[in-house]
Amino acid sequence: MIEGTGKGVATDINGSFSLEVKNGQVLTFSSVGYQTQHHVVTPDLKKLDISLRLDVEEIPEVVVVGFGKKQAVKELTGAVSKLDNVADNNSISVDKVLLGRVAGVQGGTISGQPGSTASVRIRGVASVNGRNEPVYVIDGVRVSHGDHAQNTMGNNVLAGLNNDDIESVTILKDAVSTAVYGADTGAGVVIITTKSGKKGAADFHVSSEIGLVSRAAVGEKPLTTEQWLSILYDAYLNSEEGSAAYPSKEALLADLQVGNISAGTGSILQSIYNQRHTHTDWRKLVENNMALSQKINATVSGGNDKLSYYSSLGYLKEDGIVKENSFERVTSSNKIDFQATSKLRLSTNIQLSYANTLAQPEGAQYSNPVYGQYMLRPTERAYNSDGSFNYGQYGMLSNGTYNIAALQQLNHNKNQTIRTLANFQLDYQVAKNLLYKFVFAPEYIDIGEDVYKSPIHGDGFLTKGEADWFNTRIFSFNLQNILSYDLAIKEKNHLSASLIQEAHRIDQKNINAVVLTAGSNKLKTLSSFITPASVSGTRDLNSREGYALTLHYDYDKLFLLDLSGRQDRLSNFWKENRTGYFYSVGLGVDLARLDFFRKTKQLSQLKFSTSYGRVGNMVNASPYATYRYSFNYDNQAAGIPIGVNNPDLHWETLYPLNIGLDVGFFSDRITLSVAYFQKKTKDMIFSLPLSAAQGSYTATKQVNIGEMENKGWELAINAELIKNEEGLNWELGGHISTLSNKITQMYDDTPIKLNLRVLQKGESIGVFYLKKWAGVDPNTGAPLWYKNGKDGETTSVYSEAKEAIQGSYLASLYGGFNTKISYKNISLLAQFAYGFGNKLYDSSASLAKNDGKTTYLYPGYASQVGSYWTPQNRNSENPKPIWDGNALSSEDSTRYLYDGDYLRLQTLKLSYDFPTIWLEGTYLKQLQFYVLGDNLWTYNFDKRFKGDPEAQADGRVDFILPTLRTLSFGMNINF
């Protein structure tokens, strides 16, 4: 910059710049974290080499902690992680960005629907029935998150937040960092800070990106006609009927060719054989040949001493793998910060979003295009000879399934979400060190769902058409009054304290209407149907109020102390138990601040810290919901008991312990963080079933009866390995976490059996409880199970085998690593994620790989071919197929339980920045082109599992829409 003129330029990545100057003018060179240098222009100056020196008073890295307060990382006593560059991937929502990138954070995708939610767990599972997802806070206020839709799959409130508008994400993991938020933070807190304007001239930024979408994992392939028939031949010959009638496959084929089989199950095989020349590829019909993703964002920001502003407008659309499946979004973020007087600052932040989701059914539904790929016969024609869809008879095809290609055109499943989040803030400097802050943040969400089922074919045929309309309206607000005091005593003593009052209220209304019998095939509104089927609505109103006090003290940043206490009152409980008290204490000492270590210069941090506290957890509990009045008895209002009053019902509480070590070398060019954590949950809420004599078959009593523990280690290393004057930079980082989860107390210590799993004292919350598969009898091809559920003696009789604990869906070791290499104008970023020690159960395999039980009806997986027992293949993975099944071989067991160990290349980005000198005269400050890929490569260590190891939330996969792989091309422009 030319001193005294305000005229200046930014250097390119090589340090080159071009600026017209006059003799005698002074050039000023500056950069954040470096000492400013001044050079006088002289007539003989031809070349200027500048090397800025690090500023010993470099601005410290800060993170946002409780209620918008910023704190230097080196002064923390708690477990906090920070993510920058959130937009360096193709994830639509910020919850998916967290997966694999933060120590102690694990989870999975719930659906391959674009814009769907992710399951996020911080340091294990907080509760059996309560909240296991973290609280999300945007710019200091808690917000709604998750899927609030009533019917359609894939709704995600957080998908309404544009990642390009996010400055950073901070993850709070222990008591000292979360207790100030109080009653519902046992599962952690995710703090999202959005971008703000900075002092300077208006800065315009435009980014555009277009990409190709494909499957992240190929998954199981469907059978071809030839493959299906080969299995059916063997299954029929292995049956009593087939083995008695035909001595060989050649004899069977001879009769099939002349159409001689007309009785028994052989007639079914004959009818299928007669259609052997039809080869319908259902996957090809229902999936996109070329799915696309596209987005464009435009922002303007700037400011001066009085006013700063940031405004953005963004558009995004992403197709799913299957047809008629997409997510489309428009977002806008508008932030203004105005210094009204020397003491008064006013801020507004308004975020708007509109999202339109076109969903497809998931799970074991005939209308699910993924389910149909395996269940529909390849011998069934999708189209008639005239080009119209084949609708079969009575609304279904020959095996009772639906033409999924037709349903994608006939039916629709739409979801429209409007979200408004406003944040109005006032800061007033009461005295020199005393600041008052007032925050009012309302949030409004409107979700409209429109489900239409055609009367022509499929699940709307029997009802002559169906229309389901749902509406969800959520209005909430957050009110805060905060008084903060900061004081420095004799330079080395620093004290800060905050007194906080917070109120939060959420009002949610759900309304739905179902009508049947369409008046016309072309009219799809409710008023176009003849028969009203049902109308219902609910309202949930929850409020809470809390008071908190926080205190931070440090002596020369050497000794650190954090204290907090909070009182919360929640409407979920009776008055006697509505009040909860939460606290935390954190201690730390940074030995690198001692004179002895300062002299070495190599050690920049050596901090030991520990924290402990008591935090709460939210449960959808209602101790006073005794009756449900939603039943008709002889045209009179009727109610049934659904619960029993329990005035003793109270908070679930957690007691997190954290012990940490943070080390930095060479001005933090190398950093290492180690932490041990232990999180105990007490007074877990369970719903105990009551006998029918006490109410109804569904009546329960909610009680506090359980305890649980999570513990583990976290290790994170980051290093700036190379940084030289030639423009070569190399950064390398990684993190690894361990987790041990155990239930330590239950009601009467009695195990509770769930679907495929069990809750049992001394075991993990996520353990599978199954019979153990022992393989195939090499002599007979019969299925085998271990009698005791573990090892030793085997049996081919399913009922003789016992169930036993067979592993957990929670990974015991997980993490990620990344590297970034840049040379002059070129940069390469790679991010990996991994997980080990967990199990995945394929619930769909019992239908799609069931050894002839229903194979003649529903073909299933192509992996059946060549993998089952024959006299020539005795050491096989699967039993011999028998028409109508082989000794219950497809019943639940560890046969369909896989190791979830995986390694994935999550993100790969290659970018090129045009040199600044090339942009002279173009009004451009920056021009960058890049290639960005997400989920480009995945390695499953268990070769039997063909699916996506992250496409699960609770260890089960079941015909969900495929997870997405994207490869995008984009550009960034600043002017």
Model-predicted regions and their roles:
Residues 2, 29, 136, 383, ...:
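Short aromatic-centered micro-motifs
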Residues 133, 329, 335-344, 349-354, ...:
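Extracellular/periplasmic, surface-exposed regions of secreted and cell-surface proteins
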Residues 277, 353, 358-421, 474, ...:
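Acidic/polar loop-and-plug regions of large Gram-negative outer-membrane beta-barrel proteins
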Residues 1-333, 338, 345-347, 421, ...:
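Short, small/polar-rich motifs associated with maturation and membrane association
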Residues 808-843:
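Glycine-rich, aromatic-lined ligand/substrate-binding cores of catalytic
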Residues 205-274, 722-809, 840, 849, ...:
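Conserved small-residue
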Residues 271, 570, 835-928, 933:
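Extracytoplasmic gating/loop element in the C-terminal half of outer-membrane beta-barrel translocons
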